[in-house]
Amino acid sequence: MKQGRLNVGVVGSDASGIAMAQALAQAGHMVVAVSQAPLDSDDSLEVLLPLAKKVSEEKVLELADLVLLAVPAAQIEAKIESLSNSWRAGQLVVHLAAEFDHEILAGAVSAGAIPLAIHPAMRFTGTSLDLNRMKESFFAVSAPVVALPIAQALVIEMGAEPIVIESSARASYAEAIEVASNFSAMIVNQAIGLLEQAGVPNPALVIAPVIESAVDQALSKGHRQIKPEDLIGDS
C-alpha cells in the first residue's frame, strides 16, 4: 500500500457504499474486502470491485483501515454492536446515513475507532453513472473536530464537495434530501403516467424538458413563497 493509502472494507450492500468504495479505489486506496455482493447493481462484485474479497463482516474489520457501513440507517447501531469485539484503535468507521451524525458510532469509538459520518447528497442507481454523478455532488460530513479534516479529505478524493452539517441540523438536512428525492420520483412517475393515458409516445422524453426547466428555475429562485402565478401550467 502506498504512503497515505488505506485498505478499505465494506460492510453491507447498499449502492452508496459500493460506489464510494469504487471512488476511493480510483483515488488510489485499496478496496480489500466486502461482506456482501451489491444487491442493487446489474454488475457483479468482480466487475465493480475486482480486488475485493467477499468475506465475513468480522474479517472485513480485520483487513480494513477504513470501514464503510453500507447498511440502512435503522440498522447502524445494531451493526456496530454486533461487531463490538472486532473494532480496533485507529480504524476509521464511516456510516452513510443522512439523519445521523458521527455520534451514532459510539460503540466503535469505545474500542478506539475514529467515527466519520459521510452522506452523499444524491440518489444512487447502482450503475456506473453513480461515479460520474458523485463528482457533481455534495457530501454531508460530521466527525469529531480532530477527525473532521479526514472526512473532508476523503470526500475531496472521491471528487465531491464536503459540507459540514452540525448535529442539530442533521434532521432537517435528512428531511430535505428525502423530500427532494422521493417527491421528484413521485411527480415524474405521475406525469409519465398521465402522458401514457393520453396516448403520447415516448412520454419520458416529452416530459423531461419540462421537468428540467422547472427544476432549474426553482433552484435559481431559491426558497421563497410560491405564488399562484408560479403554478400556471402553460406559463
What are these regions (language model features)?
Residues M1-E58:
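NAD(P)+-binding Rossmann beta1-loop-alpha1 motif at the extreme N-terminus of oxidoreductases
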Residues K2, A204-S235:
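NAD(P)-dependent Rossmann-like dehydrogenase/reductase catalytic/cofactor-binding core
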Residues G4-N7, G90, E136:
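Phosphate-coordination loops involved in phosphoryl transfer and adenosine-cofactor binding
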Residues V8, M30-V32, P115, P162, ...:
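Hydrophobic anchor at the start of a short beta-strand
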Residues M20, A27, L48, A108, ...:
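Internal alpha-helical scaffold of NAD(P)-dependent oxidoreductase catalytic cores
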Residues M20, V47-L129:
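Rossmann-like NAD(P)(H) cofactor-binding subdomain of soluble oxidoreductases
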Residues L39-L45, D101-I104, A147-P149:
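Short, charged/polar "capping" segments at the starts of alpha-helices
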